[in-house]
A protein has these predicted regions:
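Short Ser/Thr-interspersed hydrophobic loop/turn segments at strand-loop and sheet-helix junctions
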Residues: 441-442
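Proteolytic maturation boundary segments
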Residues: 33-37, 44, 64-210, 343, ...
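Conserved alpha/beta enzyme-core scaffolds, especially Rossmann-like or related mixed alpha/beta domains
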Residues: 348-350
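M16 family metallopeptidases and their MPP-like homologs
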Residues: 1-24, 30-87, 106-113, 184-186, ...
Length: 485
């Protein structure tokens, strides 16, 4: 568990309480059902795509067999066995096994944290005493309610597809809906149990001013904390148990995005989630407070790392101290507003008319059309014509700049970064040229710096031409070495 400073005893109480709850009362039937359904779904998905497994999945299985023993029956046999065995295992047997693992002997209590003068840690005796006290706390059986209501209780009348045509280059079906949304459908047979979705709209974080810079730093982490519709994030996970489906909205530098995937059998659920994230985002102050507390604790510890200070200094040097380029810090949370973030989210996703939804995978066009008409053609639209604001993109510092940064390290080392920037036309030829340049530099640096000079374990390089702002180009080389070299 991640613990707030000064609340080690509370965290220990919570851990011991939940362990004791399992020991005394076991898991509930609904908890077990969800876990079992999820396991069966995972095996089903692996079985359906058994002819598309990557080499590393076989390699990893052979390595496990060599190091740990066991069997390699193959997914066909494994799926058949799990399908037969899992439904026959009662909750009582699972609880009996779980309770047999929780005893009063061979218990290890581990506590780690930063070595800071203002943090007081308990002694070994105090920690053991707190643990014994926590075991005596009253524990009630776990109670939960799992909603059986539909994800969307009431739907509007379906919309219509205004136009359907075939893209001559890729053979995809392109639909234009009567609310302006475009939908691209491309059937592939690479994976039988997967449909991928991506949706984009021009705009993005550059449409927000300086007062929202700190809010943007956690925007994508926060917007789905509360779940969607009538379901909290926790309840939504329960409802989606046994389904291979995921959906996540986000904002980028110059776009709003919705990404997701689903098995063909769960495609309707994917469309329902898309509809909910556009029309019924949900706030949860308690979930946000928990997120904020965790982040502040993590960031305070992170800031003790000298290499983080090095990275911060590098970012300031490259982007001329532009606040939009800076990473999030613990102090930023003093300016971050959860209600404002949700306002920003609703503002960006209030108009779906300029979104393009692309679906790729095991798609049946006739089967997907009713979902498109019901869930996408009914999304709210305002007819806004937007594009990103390149003036709000952090500009790379011009001219030559040298910064020598010193910080004490337990293991002394020197880190050297060379960064070059410029402008180059954004096209396929230049992108490929930049990629090949990076690969050539990797080979040269490996031979000259690592092998011939023995100056480092390796050199990291990158070369990139951005599409937004168009043509912004940079080349970077990073090396860690002995200060004497």
């Amino acid at each position: 568990a991640l613990v707030k400073v000064g609340e080690i005893d509370k965290a220990l109480d919570a851990l011991v309480t939940e362990t004791e709850r399992v020991k005394r009362y076991g898991f509930t039937a609904s908890e077990y059902d969800r876990a079992r359904i999820n396991v069966l779904k995972q095996y089903e998905s692996l079985f359906n795509d058994r002819d598309k497994q990557k080499n590393r999945s076989y390699t990893n299985e052979y390595v496990r067999h060599f190091t740990d023993g066991g069997y390699i029956p193959g997914i066909e046999t494994e799926y058949q066995l799990i399908s037969q065995i899992a439904p026959q295992i009662p909750i009582e047997q699972v609880n009996q096994y779980a309770q047999s693992l929780i005893g009063d002997k061979n218990i290890v209590i581990g506590l780690t944290g930063p070595d800071k003068a203002d943090i007081k840690y308990p002694t070994e005796a105090q920690l053991l005493e707190d643990f014994i006290k926590a075991q005596q706390l009253p524990v009630k059986p776990y109670e939960e309610t799992v909603s059986n209501e539909p994800l969307i209780p009431e739907l509007p009348a379906p919309g219509k597809i205004r136009e359907m045509k075939t893209d001559p280059l890729f053979g995809a079906t392109v639909l234009t809906l009567d609310n302006g949304i475009k939908v691209v459908l491309k059937h592939t047979d690479f994976k039988k149990d997967e449909i991928l979705m991506t949706a984009t709209s021009p705009g993005g974080s550059t449409l927000f001013g300086a007062k929202d810079i700190d809010n943007l730093k956690v925007f994508n982490d926060v917007i789905t904390l509360g779940g969607a519709g009538n379901f909290s994030a926790t309840d939504l996970n329960k409802v989606l148990a046994g389904k291979k489906v995921s959906c996540s909205p986000s904002i980028g530098l110059n776009t709003e995005n919705v990404n997701g995937y689903a098995a063909p059998a769960d495609l309707k659920t994917l469309f329902e989630l898309v509809y909910l994230y556009f029309t019924a985002p949900r706030m949860d102050e308690e979930a946000y407070t928990s997120f904020e507390n965790r982040m502040i604790a993590q960031l305070k510890n992170l800031e003790l790392n000298p290499m983080v200070a090095f990275s911060d200094t590098l970012t300031k040097a490259i982007y001329d101290n532009n606040p939009r380029a800076a990473r999030i810090t613990a102090d930023d949370f003093k300016q971050i507003s959860y209600p404002r973030i949700m306002e920003m989210y609703k503002e960006r996703f209030a108009d779906a008319s300029d979104f393009v939804f692309t679906f790729v995978g095991n798609i049946d066009t006739d089967s997907i059309r009713p979902f498109v008409e019901q869930y996408l053609a009914t999304l709210p639209v305002k007819g806004r014509a937007e594009k990103a604001n390149p003036a709000e993109v952090p500009a790379i510092r011009k001219g030559e700049y040298t910064n020598i940064f010193k910080r004490a390290l337990e293991t002394p080392k020197a880190s050297v970064v060379n960064f070059w920037s410029g402008k180059m036309e954004y096209n396929l030829e230049n992108i490929l040229t930049a990629t090949m340049l990076k690969q050539i530099l990797d080979l040269v640096y490996m031979e000259k710096v690592r092998e011939d000079e023995g100056g480092t374990y390796g050199v990291q390089t990158s070369a990139q031409i951005s599409s937004f702002p168009e043509g912004q180009t940079f080349l970077q080389a990073y090396i860690d070495t002995d200060p004497a070299k």
